[in-house]
Amino acid sequence: MSHTETHAFQTEVNQLLKLMIHALYSNKEIFLRELVSNASDALDKLRFESVSNDALSEGESELAIQVGFDKEARTVSIIDNGIGMTRDEVIANIGTIANSGTKKFLENMTGDQAKDSHLIGQFGVGFYASFIVADKVTLTTRKAGDDKSEGTRWESAGEGEYTLETVEKETKGTEITLHLKEDMDEFLDDFRLKSIITTYSDHINFPIKMWQVKLDEEGKETEEKSLEQVNKATAIWTQPKSELSDEDYNNFYQTISHDYENPLAHIHNKVEGTLEYTSLLYLPKKAPFDLYDRDRRYGLKLYVKRVFIMDDAEHLMPTYLRFVRGVIDSNDLPLNVSREILQSNRVVDKIRSASVKRVLDQLAKMAKAEDQSDYETFWDQFGNVMKEGVIEDFANKDKIAKLLRFSSTHESSGPTQRVSLQDYIDRMGEGQEAIYYITADTYAAATGSPHLEMFRKKGIEVLLLTDRIDEWLVSHLTEFEGKQLKSVTSADLKEFDEEADKELSEEDKKAREALTEKVKKAIEDQVSDVKITHRLTDSPACVVSAEGDISAHMARMMEQMGQAMPKQKPVLELNPDHALVKKLDSLEDEPKVKEWSLFLLEQAQLAEGDQLEKPADFIKRMNALLSEVI
């Protein structure tokens, strides 16, 4: 007759149970992940110890995990034929936190065995996840090699104590039975359990089997059942690249991404040395609908020694690469005790840095390819978020800058963004020292801007920046390959003014100074300065931002986002060769000068996409001036 003993949990275990049941894990289904993971550890231990002691296998050739449920008894069971535990090991490993047998086993391993151990139980807490869904847990185990009479049964309701009993157990290994809580019936379902296994344990190194109802020739259920494997038990990323086809890579991508299209590219690397991990990364062909939702969780799937730990491991990839899909499988990546949140440390930083480099290198390769179609597809889908990288990732700013694409005034460009900064530099004329750009709300607004008139006349290409992020982009990317990026709407375009001023007589210069002073006096409350410009050929006037001010386009965007912006006075630039400006110059009556000056200012502001404070006044003013010439 067996003897039953009652033991109290170690104090820390009591605390852990309360914490885990109520708060520690983010979803209750991970109990199965933890128990399958523990079973995998036990099989790993047996496999290695059997190398030096074949008797431990006890004649069983296949190492496997079995998952089942009993609707009537309301139980879920997880069975393995692994190494098992002695009575003392049960007390030490289950009754005591952070003292798991796996951790001690690792300490005793050396050489190549440690590399392939795939052991994940360093924290010794996974077993307690059982109590998230169960109000009683029964564990029956026998150490491989021990007599059948030396089995141990452990049982607890998770309320401060557990019982131990010596029992007979025919087979080595461990069987865990969870007596489910009243509200946990969802786990008494074949499809639900298989779904959890597929999500968390598909790539465990051992087969996971469940009893499946056999079907007859017509596909109908019969009374017979058979044990069927429900996981793949092969991790594609652990296989040599030479043994994998594009179809293999594409199928796995569709599995992890739930994307029906194939990816644009995959990046598969195995790193060995002081840091050991494997990465399999994918570049999607199409952006997800929530790509611009900054609150959405993103990131890679994290595995530790082929055991799934979490989706969306955001520490492993920066925000601007949030579209990258794939897995990181680490042999030594540290996790916190819940295994739900990555610890940010040197190892994480190294994996992240190397992964970012591989993605950027792959994109650079695509961007340089003779066939640009893949990179063009990528840019059309993800170009906006790549621009975030210039702002967020200073270390890789130069690499990212080479990947940027824009539309431009070059004859072959059009509205699609196909022009790189290097393309622009290669087409620069002799003596040109800057890369010129204009920001606008739309392509049509950019191409219609008066600021482009002089650049078109001189045959100087201008980049057309029409994405909302572009204003922030150029505030961080101020030069490329030694060439300054300069806005055509900036007041600081002295190189063109100085060139034109050399051709003027002293008399003309004085006349123009008199014109600007007259206009500035008339509307000094509306402008910071008035200048003669040489950037216009067809328009009478334009407005530019004063030196040190943000651009008008940026100010509009900030206001649209609810930011209170201080009132900025623009610089009004006049085209002295235009008929309307000549008319203004001829006027002596101050009220008339003011009306004409305001008309040219407001017209220029409208051309730049600004909203007038009093549009009705502009219409009245325009009608009055038109009436004068009829």
Swiss-Prot record:
GO cellular component, one term: cytoplasm
Subcellular location: Cytoplasm
Keyword entries, A-Z: ATP-binding, Chaperone, Cytoplasm, Nucleotide-binding, Stress response
GO molecular function (one): ATP hydrolysis activity
InterPro entries: HATPase_C_sf, Heat_shock_protein_90_CS, HSP90_C, Hsp90_fam, Hsp90_N, Ribosomal_Su5_D2-typ_SF
Residue numbers spanned by region A: 1-339
Tagged with keyword Nucleotide-binding: yes
Domain of life: Bacteria
Keyword ATP-binding tagged: yes
Pfam families tied to this protein: HATPase_c_3, HSP90
Region of interest (C), ranges: 557-630
Principal location: cytoplasm
Region entry B, spans: 340-556
Similarity comment text for this entry: Belongs to the heat shock protein 90 family.
Quaternary structure annotation from Swiss-Prot or TrEMBL: Homodimer.
Free-text function comment from the UniProt entry: Molecular chaperone. Has ATPase activity.
NCBIfam families (UniProt xref): PRK05218.1 (NF003555)
Name under which the protein is recorded: Chaperone protein HtpG
Species this chain originates from: Hydrogenovibrio crunogenus (strain DSM 25203 / XCL-2) (Thiomicrospira crunogena)
Gene from which the chain derives: htpG
